[in-house]
């Protein structure tokens, strides 16, 4: 299981300072919509210069198939190791994306977002008209059949996805509160042991790290628990 640190901070300088603080640690960096809209490609390049961190670009692309495929080809030109799209875009979009990316000599990992961890069961049903478990099964099936590399999901759907697809189908799980910290705006959260039990491949941790007085010490503690 790998640690992915969410750099969801308020400025470019804070991102770079956090990267410097974590230099040398075996982890991935997640750059989300806020940071990418604010700082763009220069942030990705600057983080790579601090240390050759692997980068997960968390933009959750969602559009018509051709537009998504074009965008994903552009993303593949960036120095990122993984990005995500919404499974709700459907199988046609996912197949087109993977056909384009697989024609390249090198491509990033591509994950599909199932149900945002900010959803509880009631709110999810009001949008999708089915329960989370069934939707995740459906989304994971079409994502796997389309050739994607894995899913973004809550810890509580990780095992379900692997059982429905393959043990090698990646699950990346946000909403991790390593030592049972406050869940903030996340609804379906879990700790490290729960992530281990549910065979998560990546855990995403943000606020418990970047809001800490000693982010490096927190990361080292998490990495020790992942062994």
From Swiss-Prot:
Name this polypeptide is given: Orotidine 5'-phosphate decarboxylase
NCBIfam families: PRK00230.1, pyrF
HAMAP family in the cross-refs: OMPdecase_type1_B
Family in the record: Belongs to the OMP decarboxylase family. Type 1 subfamily.
Xref: CDD domains: OMP_decarboxylase_like
Described purpose of this protein according to its UniProt entry: Catalyzes the decarboxylation of orotidine 5'-monophosphate (OMP) to uridine 5'-monophosphate (UMP).
Residue numbers annotated as active site: 60 (proton donor)
Pfam families, per database record: OMPdecase (PF00215)
Known partners and oligomeric status: Homodimer.
GO BP annotations, alphabetical order: 'de novo' pyrimidine nucleobase biosynthetic process; 'de novo' UMP biosynthetic process
